[in-house]
Amino acid sequence: MAAALAQPRSGGEDRISELPEALLSDILSRLGTAEAARTVVLSTRFRDAWLGTPLRLDDLQLPAPARGKVPSIEPWTARADAITRALASHPGPVPLFRLSRTTFRGRVSAAEAWFRDLAARGAREVSLRCSPEWCHEARADPLLASPTLEVLALGKCRLTDAGASAAAAARLTELTLSETSLSEAGLQSALSGCPALRTLMLKHVHGIQRIRVSSCRSLVLLGVWHYKQLEEITVEDAPCLERLLGNIRLNAAITIAGAPKLTALGYVVASIPMSFLGETAPPGVNKGIRAPIPSVKVLAISVKFSKKEDMEKAISVLEFFPFLETLHVQSSDPSYEVAADENDAIVSDYYQQCDPISCLTRHLRIVRLGCEHHNRSMLEFACFLLARAHVLQFMKIQSRMSTNQQNLLKQSHMASLDAELVFENVKDRKSFTLEAVTALSDPFDGDTNILGY
């Protein structure tokens, strides 16, 4: 479009000079970073408009750095240097700053200067989508003090207690921290400074053994991943919270109070490692869920079907959700046969001895079981659910099962005459994205790998 406008009339007039600057700025704002930079050479009017046009900087839209032109510069710093030049050449606002393939290696001080600059220039989205280890512990404190910021996603950065206590991101609605270093006190301060927060994603944040989310009255989605040493998750006074996702291990004390809209929880991981980074698990850590959560309608569990201890935990977990309607159970059994410890093996009459569970008797309508390989123990658990779930409408099993095995399951006793059995082969799961999960009424009813995020 810009190239067409630049074509002179038959009289040699510059048609671009006739256009208002607001229109030129609008044209530039609709182009990618590289295209906009190339367009400004067409006319001095475009160059003038460029200076006042908001810069949407996405490194996927930048040309690949030329190799070999400057031998003294390491190749991994070339893209970071291009980012520095782009910010320096454009004095206007920078509403979008998104990095997917830029490493801070050798340029940490430059990255920290970017963060200060972005906070001062009205950034609305700052997303470091590159590999977390590429961020090299850059300090990101200034971003939490940005009053214009709406979306913040950090990789392996640092947030100091002083920076977190100065958080004043009044418009921030989405915060993602991946392998970021932050203290428990710093997390509390950061949350207090983000009153509009709707989504909080914590992935392997260093320095935290207790996650406490209190008085986050706008929070809708909380994600917690990869915390083998996590001792406690506490959610209090979160009236809008609807989903708690991640791989939440039962070795943590889980307390949820004041979250009346919480309807989806998972994955709750029943298989508990008995060591933490080579050390014996501290006494009293295996605490699990503290009190019933009646609002939850959708629950996802990760379990080893072949282990009696795991199944006891999984069944006891069901008792905390008296109004559960949909249950997802994903196997974490190895793909190879393991000789079971006879003291921890599922015996033939194990499920017959289980006491009645309220949600199975009255409310459970949908069950989805998944296992990457044939697992006899999973079939026994499926038979248990079919025999106990009186209002079951639908059960889907994703596994490699023979026709004979499917027929045996169909012939098992079913407490619900309306129950429908569906068998599927195992499907590859896609990488986790917020967009994919929030688009589903049931966040576990899709091909997104929530457990492996």
Go through the PLM ranges and name each one.
Residues 1-8, 275-283, 298-300, 325-328, ...:
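C-terminal capping region of solenoid repeat domains
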Residues 2-206, 212-216, ...:
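Leucine-rich repeat
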Residues 45, 142, 165-168, 187-190, ...:
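C-terminal per-repeat helix/turn "cap" of leucine-rich repeat
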Residues 55-58, 95-100, 124-129, 150-155, ...:
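Conserved hydrophobic beta-strand positions in leucine-rich repeat
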Residues 125, 159-160, 182-183, 203, ...:
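Extracellular beta-strand scaffolds
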Residues 252-308, 320-323:
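Extended repeat-based solenoid scaffolds, especially LRR ectodomains
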